[in-house]
């Protein structure tokens, strides 16, 4: 079963010249180092050669949608979002609704915003140009600068942290922050709390601890910083008036430093270039890891000092963009890189002197990997998204178990989501709805601007055990034959 799913159209994404002012912003935002004119000619020529087949492959993917998915929602965004996260689940009129966090990265004609949306029941129909009726904007927060990253607090998911182009981390109580109307000239919303300590911009690396209200960040100052916001949780998490909005009755203000702030609990140095992503050990607020543009993976233990406890100096062959720690097995760490690969490291095989080899290496993307995340539903499964517009689902348990029908399928790949038409900048597995993913892409280089948000769940016939699926299909086959004979 998995071989047919893995053979889902591996559509190649075209990249046209930008058509909106926001494109220039986004191109620079994705932390890619500039290339010389000679280096940039090859991708351009490849784009032109691939363009003729893109429409056909995308059309083919659309025809397979009813077969490959149990549910699917496509929601067109006026402005791109660089991040997406699931929030708390709500019970409304007998139906289940879950909050979504995303952003609007604008070109300056209107303010940048942090958006809280409600997501309702999903379906299988695809409308490429429409705003889905199942995704409704609930509240808008005018954000001080572009929202590069959103992370929710596991102990209270109505509280989120955001990264922008500044050294500070902004903490928001999304429930008590006032709803704002984003028009040009409107003052910024005031964050409920500021986390200070970086000496340079901290744009992307951000994590919230699963066990305690700790926050982790990395930035251009090459440092990893740890905060404990426990002293402010009661204030920021209460349903009373938001402290960030108490300075002005409407919760508005151009000076985000006017609210309360928290200094770092620890500053950890060891990277030699920008820290691009960080992650907590799922069972400890004192253990965490980081990756950066120095191609290093570093593991830290706050109890033993501010130097790396373990590291891999050449974890990939290029910059590392993303990292995630397995919530089921504390020994496994996942990394993604500009070398187009995803790797899995076992911390039991790492040392403090920079030595360590991956236990798995996955090759299935054609461009830089931007996001990786372990599945909450199965310990061996994870997802990876990349600049090639694909979101791949992998299973470590399937490595080395290719069937004859899947000889061209990358080892370990068992599902490929090809619904986005440009780079998939972020995705998030739902903790409340099994095997459900929200993903976002920005469409500036393919279809001229805006973004796409998709909420989807692959067919359970794909991820369930094959013998179980075959037994069920055999029963269905017998039922069909019985009904046919009676008619």
Swiss-Prot record:
Transmembrane segments: none annotated. SUPFAM superfamilies: WD40 repeat-like (SSF50978). Keywords: Acetylation, Chromatin regulator, Nucleus, Repeat, Repressor, Transcription, Transcription regulation, WD repeat. The keyword Repeat applies. GO terms for cellular component: Cul4-RING E3 ubiquitin ligase complex; ESC/E(Z) complex. It is found in: Nucleus. Residues 1-12 have a biased composition (Low complexity). A motif (Nuclear localization signal) lies at residues 14-21. Disruption phenotype: Reduced H3K27me3 level but increased levels of histone H3 acetylation and H3K4me3 on FLC in the fve msi5 double mutant. Residues 237-252 have a biased composition (Polar residues). Coiled coil: none annotated. Gene3D superfamilies: YVTN repeat-like/Quinoprotein amine dehydrogenase (2.130.10.10). It comes from the Eukaryota. A motif (DWD box) lies at residues 288-303. Core histone-binding subunit that may target chromatin assembly factors, chromatin remodeling factors and histone deacetylases to their histone substrates in a manner that is regulated by nucleosomal DNA. Acts together with PDP1 and MSI4/FVE to regulate the function of the PRC2 complex on FLC. The DWD box is required for interaction with DDB1A. Interacts with AHL16. Interacts with LHP1, PDP2, PDP3 and PDP6. Component of the PRC2 (polycomb repressive complex 2) complex which regulates histone methylation on histone H3K27. Belongs to the WD repeat RBAP46/RBAP48/MSI1 family. This is WD-40 repeat-containing protein MSI5. It comes from Arabidopsis thaliana (Mouse-ear cress). The gene is MSI5.
